[in-house]
Amino acid sequence: MNDRELDLTEEQKALKAKYPPITKKYEYLDHTADVQIHSWGNSLEEAFEQCAMGMFGYMTDTETVEPIDTVEVESEGDDMESLLYHFLDDWLFKFSADIFFIPREVKVLHIDRMRYKIRSIGWGEEFSINKHPQGTEVKAITYSAMQIHETEQPEIFVIIDI
């Protein structure tokens, strides 16, 4: 399943038509009781960005989100896997426990591979059930079967708890 089909209202369809389509370099892979996100990019930064957008794409149609507000997220870890975990968890916090922020786009500004720190920014708005279609709630990020492949075209595999 490459994309989730959500029933959109005419208003949501009109909103999607206002902006160019979002490039999606992620897919959802079946996993028992959970969902695995497989993301990729031309760089590790892009693979991280796409992984975050894959997580948000499971919760709503991100093309119905308008880039009204900006949120910055800084995360750190002890290795690349924990950095990815905290990066996704910090973005999930912005949605579920902080300001209900849903991004249309996430951009990684810098990954410090020596100190395992990442700076990122997202453009979006506050989630509104009246404006955005409701997908499936993401409860948590997991370390289970987490993989980061730093090849010519980096790939990431992450299981999210739904």
From Swiss-Prot:
One of its GO terms (biological process) is tRNA splicing, via endonucleolytic cleavage and ligation. Pfam families: Archease (PF01951). It comes from the Eukaryota. Transmembrane segments: none annotated. GO terms for molecular function: metal ion binding. Component of the tRNA-splicing ligase complex required to facilitate the enzymatic turnover of catalytic subunit RTCB. Together with ddx1, acts by facilitating the guanylylation of RTCB, a key intermediate step in tRNA ligation. Component of the tRNA-splicing ligase complex. This is Protein archease. It comes from Danio rerio. The lineage of its organism: Eukaryota, Metazoa, Chordata, Craniata, Vertebrata.
